[in-house]
């Protein structure tokens, strides 16, 4: 469906062909063996077929799937298959194809031969290719056709192997009983005689399930094991032996108190039932009954065909209903208990594994799993180009011993260990480290103290497990730059790293540090970096201001160790020897199901380590200070830098920009981090220049690109600091999130109100409000508020049980959450209050009112003022007047959590729904007349007047009154009892109305 294979377990790996012009994927390969490594052959996967290399314990083999479309020429498919055959070479390859061609070579039945059809002509072409390419057909004669549909039967499916596969034995058979598709399933058994399984399978890290662990008992077990060995004896062993002993004690306690984590999890197929099994058997019987007499021309042929089709339709209906019912029960039990759990991850697609693809290196694709991983690792971890003699010189300098380690230092570092995160190679998670520190702090303190005294970082903690993530789904998968490496390090080693980084931060307090690095600094964020740029642009007296967004190529991966050591030496770090040990002998490995690829690391900051950010901040500080000294203004967040340059002429801008980039280039050359001329961009932030002649700023003779719109630190901005592109981007992002969660945010079932509210605030509002303090002032323009509230409408419609035609104003009140323009304003003003920024004219709270307010008082007052603004809008709005009668106060739903309604009550509260009066206005009904004869069927008529529902009506119980001949609904939601009765009345009313309408249509 739309190029995807759906309905399979999440543990299955699916590779599909490229989407063709009509949006249909035509072939796929599904791998259900979790113990196999899969390499997608990118240069042999296109619109004609799919090719993967599967590596198991005994051998590697190419698996190819080809679908030749009916009625099309075979030439392009033969060219594709020839390319695959050449690519596979002498490696075993098996190809399954729907050839839409017949031939005696693959035992097609005789009645389909000699008729001059296109499939026979294609069969002749395929025969020639098979013979020329020395391919082997492993089809065997069968009484069953490979294709058997209502319109005919034929043997059009071919299975081929190359010469390398000819040495194995095959059992090829058609299995008509295994499925109900027109294409019968084909089973192929391969006898791999003579092949021996790998005796040294890939090592797997130990993992334990920490859920429901009794940590008190766990700590007692760790302490008991440590006490058996004794602290005195522990103090006398080497550092590496201490690490091994501590790990052994933790493993013992883990095995006693927890279950080992298994990579393969099996889930019972709960939706399959006896009724489905019986219906499937009936469908097979009817299919065979039809096939037996089809060629005989029996008189009952049409009856049997119709019976087969009816049974097939019924079977599919039962399948869909069973799957949907099971999914609904799963959503109800899982998501309402934990909205961020398995259901959320399934909807977001987070559980789908990403297979390694063949990558292009110097114009040539890799053809093995190990080759692809090695090529990626060579990009992620480039070889060092540092001067070894200079490193030896630094190592030879005599240095004083570091200060004695304090218990508080270790305790603070342990406390900063993150929980519920993936562990390193040793499998020890943050929860375990905290528990071990609570059980045997003296042993851990002894270990880290000796590391500092000996200036030795244990070798075991310098080995990282590599995880390769695809940056974006639309990236070119054959490009190593499309992937992000994450190094998983041992948490015990991260504790020592934390101690080292903390001491380095204290040492840097005596060194000049640029205030314009906003990353890795307490109290600073991306929003602070953006506001700093905004203030500089607004305060600039120059006629023109441009922003240079500097891109450092592989910043963390390429940073030279020598540059870091030199900066540590300049800072006179007392732990220099420990840092030297930390950088030496580092290794990384990538584990597959059947193998492991290792590499020595001689450069860069491990992405995932605690020291990486500190090292980058230390080294980049030199560039920031140099640019400021040269008269430039720069704001940096990690490796993202924006240089703001002002001038009164184009030529001056170009001269300053070129000189600035030259400074960055020279610094990057020294620290082995080149500036990427292709990704560095320029944008005009102030002033007007000709669109046909943007500023020409060069880096080593290459002009950097000028952009009219850029994305920086997650925020889109256009020329002259216009944030309109960001609101357009937000709509697309919110729409994507809503689309993912529509599987569980349904009108008649799905997430409950509690889960919906959690996702609304924790996902949608958080996504919308990112960077709000930067762009919320733009909301004074009507276009910005309109665009932002349109984004909110997408979420509200998915969250509420109302019709699509309900206005945004009504949905905001029914949901009880601030309009997004007010929510963004609230978050922006709160951020400014925390930073001590003075309010401007038009803000809800004046400067005088802010005096003496605490943070909580300001937050409460701000919310009240914004609610008043919202109330004013609701009172004067021309839309939603019926809803205003039910809910005149915007605070009502916020103050009453029980206000959760279904679709029928949504009809009542909004006036939009299954009512002739409403439908007639929109051209969806021929008449506004009610079935009782009243001229206009609307909500008030149904609730208070229509005689068809008199026996269901309880006006007093529902809080409804008849005043002056009209229905007063203001008391309908006055208390939970009236609300529940009104809800029941609405369900009964519209249920009966639906039945009456069906009866009228039948009579007509």
Swiss-Prot record:
Which key words tag this protein in UniProt?
Endonuclease, Hydrolase, Nuclease, Nucleotidyltransferase, RNA-directed DNA polymerase, Transferase, Transposable element
- Record-annotated Reverse transcriptase domain positions: 450-717
Q: What class of enzyme is it?
A: transferase
Q: What is its EC number?
A: 2.7.7.49
Instruction: Tell me the segments the record calls region Nucleic acid-binding endonuclease.
Output: 853-1004
Nucleotidyltransferase is among the record's keywords: yes
- Asked whether the UniProt record includes Hydrolase among its keywords, one would answer yes
The record's InterPro entries line, in alphabetical order, gives: DNA/RNA_pol_sf, Endo/exonu/phosph_ase_sf, Endo/exonuclease/phosphatase, RT_dom
* Catalyzed reactions: DNA(n) + a 2'-deoxyribonucleoside 5'-triphosphate = DNA(n+1) + diphosphate
The entry lists its GO molecular-function terms as: endonuclease activity; RNA-directed DNA polymerase activity
Tell me the PROSITE patterns matching this sequence. Answer: RT_POL
| Protein name per its UniProtKB record | Retrovirus-related Pol polyprotein from type-1 retrotransposable element R1
Question: What is the organism of origin for this protein?
Answer: Bradysia coprophila
């Amino acid at each position: 469906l739309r190029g995807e294979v759906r309905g399979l377990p999440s543990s299955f790996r699916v590779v599909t062909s490229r989407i063709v012009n009509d949006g249909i994927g035509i072939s796929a390969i599904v791998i259900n063996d979790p113990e196999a490594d899969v390499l997608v052959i990118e240069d042999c996967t296109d619109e004609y077929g799919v090719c993967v290399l599967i590596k198991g314990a005994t051998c590697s083999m190419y698996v190819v799937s080809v679908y030749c479309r009916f009625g099309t020429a075979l030439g392009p498919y033969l060219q594709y298959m020839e390319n695959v055959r050449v690519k596979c070479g002498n490696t075993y390859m098996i190809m399954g194809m729907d050839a839409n061609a017949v031939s005696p070579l693959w035992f097609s039945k005789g009645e389909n031969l000699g008729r001059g059809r296109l499939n026979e002509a294609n069969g002749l072409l395929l025969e020639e290719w098979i013979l020329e390419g020395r391919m082997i057909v492993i089809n065997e004669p069968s009484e069953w056709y490979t294709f058997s549909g209502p319109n005919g039967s034929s043997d059009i499916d071919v299975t081929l192997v190359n010469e390398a596969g000819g040495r194995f034995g095959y059992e090829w058979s058609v299995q008509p009983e295994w499925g109900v598709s027109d294409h019968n399933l084909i089973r192929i058994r391969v006898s791999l005689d003579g092949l021996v399984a790998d005796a040294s399978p890939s090592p797997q890290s130990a993992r334990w399930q920490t859920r429901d662990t009794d940590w008190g008992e766990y700590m007692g077990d760790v302490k008991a094991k440590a006490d058996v060995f004794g602290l005195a004896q522990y103090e006398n062993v080497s550092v590496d032996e201490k690490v091994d002993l501590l790990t052994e004690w933790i493993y013992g306690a883990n095995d006693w108190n927890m279950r080992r984590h298994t990579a393969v999890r099996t889930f019972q197929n709960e939706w399959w039932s006896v009724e489905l099994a019986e219906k499937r058997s009936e469908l097979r019987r009817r299919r065979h009954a039809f096939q037996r007499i089809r060629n005989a021309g029996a008189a009952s042929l049409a009856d049997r065909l119709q019976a087969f089709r009816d049974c097939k339709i019924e079977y599919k209906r039962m399948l869909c209903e069973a799957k949907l019912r099971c999914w609904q029960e799963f959503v109800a039990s899982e998501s309402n208990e934990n909205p961020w759990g398995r259901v959320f991850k399934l909807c977001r697609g987070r559980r789908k594994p990403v297979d390694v693809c063949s990558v292009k290196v110097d114009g040539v694709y890799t053809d093995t799993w190990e080759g692809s991983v090695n090529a990626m690792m060579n990009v992620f971890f480039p070889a060092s180009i540092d001067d070894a003699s200079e490193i030896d010189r630094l190592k030879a300098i005599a240095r004083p011993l570091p200060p004695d380690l304090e218990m508080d230092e270790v305790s603070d570092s342990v406390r900063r260990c993150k929980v519920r995160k993936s562990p390193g190679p040793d499998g020890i998670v943050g929860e375990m480290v905290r528990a071990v520190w609570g059980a045997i702090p003296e042993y851990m303190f002894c270990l880290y103290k000796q590391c500092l005294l000996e200036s030795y970082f244990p070798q075991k903690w310098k080995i990282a497990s590599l995880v390769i993530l695809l940056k974006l789904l639309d990236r070119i998968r054959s490009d190593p730059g499309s992937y992000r490496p994450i190094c998983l390090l041992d948490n015990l080693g991260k504790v020592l790293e934390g101690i080292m980084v903390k001491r380095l931060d204290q040492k840097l307090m005596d060194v000049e540090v640029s205030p314009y690095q906003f990353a890795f600094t307490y109290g600073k964020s991306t929003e602070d970096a953006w506001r700093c740029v905004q203030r500089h642009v607004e305060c600039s007296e120059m006629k023109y201001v441009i922003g240079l967004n500097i891109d450092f190529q592989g910043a963390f991966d390429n940073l030279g160790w020598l540059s870091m050591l030199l900066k540590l030496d300049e800072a006179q770090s007392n732990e220099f020897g420990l840092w030297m040990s930390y950088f030496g002998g580092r290794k990384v490995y990538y584990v597959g199901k059947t193998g492991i690829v290792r590499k020595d690391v001689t450069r860069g900051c491990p992405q995932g380590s605690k020291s990486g950010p500190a090292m980058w901040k230390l080294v980049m500080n030199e560039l920031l200070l140099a640019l400021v000294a040269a008269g430039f203004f720069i704001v940096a967040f990690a490796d993202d830098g924006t240089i703001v340059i002002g001038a009164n002429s184009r030529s001056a801008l170009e001269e300053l920009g070129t000189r600035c980039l030259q400074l960055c280039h020279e610094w990057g050359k020294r620290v082995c981090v080149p500036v990427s001329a292709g990704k560095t961009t320029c944008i005009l932030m102030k002033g007007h220049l000709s669109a046909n002649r943007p500023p020409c700023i060069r880096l080593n003779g290459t002009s950097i690109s000028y952009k009219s719109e850029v994305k920086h630190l997650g925020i889109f901005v256009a020329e002259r600091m216009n944030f309109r592109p960001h609101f357009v981007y937000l709509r697309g992002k919110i729409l994507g999130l809503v689309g993912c969660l529509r599987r569980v945010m349904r009108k008649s079932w799905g997430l409950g109100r509690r889960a919906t509210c959690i996702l609304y605030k924790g996902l949608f509002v958080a996504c919308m409000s990112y960077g709000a303090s930067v762009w919320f002032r733009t909301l004074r323009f009507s276009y910005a508020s309109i665009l932002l509230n349109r984004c909110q409408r997408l979420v509200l419609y998915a969250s509420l049980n109302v019709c699509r035609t309900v206005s945004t104003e009504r949905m905001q009140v029914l949901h009880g959450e601030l309009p997004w323009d007010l929510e963004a304003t609230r978050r922006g003003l709160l951020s400014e209050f925390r930073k001590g920024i003075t309010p401007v004219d038009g803000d809800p709270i004046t400067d005088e009112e802010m005096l003496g307010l605490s943070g909580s008082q300001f937050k409460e007052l701000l919310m009240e003022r914004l609610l008043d603004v919202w109330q004013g809008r609701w009172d004067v709005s021309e839309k939603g007047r019926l809803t205003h009668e039910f809910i005149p106060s915007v605070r009502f739903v916020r103050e009453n959590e029980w206000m959760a309604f279904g679709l029928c009550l949504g009809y009542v509260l909004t006036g939009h729904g299954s009512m002739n009066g409403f439908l007639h206005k929109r051209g969806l009904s021929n008449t506004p007349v009610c079935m009782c004869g009243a001229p206009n069927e609307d909500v008030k008529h149904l609730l208070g007047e229509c005689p068809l529902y008199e026996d269901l009506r309880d006006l007093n119980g529902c809080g409804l009154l008849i005043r002056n001949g009209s229905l007063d609904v203001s008391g309908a939601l006055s208390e939970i009892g009236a609300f529940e009765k009104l809800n029941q009345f609405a369900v009964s009313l519209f249920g009966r109305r639906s039945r009456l309408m069906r009866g009228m249509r039948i009579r007509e």
